[in-house]
Amino acid sequence: NFENEVLRSDKPVLLDFYADWCGPCKMLSPILHELAEEKSGALKVGKVNVDEQMELAMRFQVSSIPMLVVFKDGKAVAKSVGYRPKSEIAAMVEGAR
């Protein structure tokens, strides 16, 4: 699923590495939902629970959450750790296009 949905995607993918117990992750969630709706034709947005997907978290060296990673053409092209306002996340996504 990760391979097809993220690495082979024909659009950029914004992945949110999070945990249910993480306060800043919960604050970020509605922002990511808004971005997913606004850019639905041009961007995929996904979430990875680091407690349930430890292998993926280790693969992308997630040491702090929330961590956002933008993938394009199968490669991680931008990363951000911690809470960020919507404008910064949108700029990070646009910069990766």
Task: Put a short name on every predicted segment.
Residues 17-31:
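Conserved redox-active cysteine motifs that mediate thiol-disulfide chemistry
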Residues 1-13, 54:
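A short beta-strand-turn-helix
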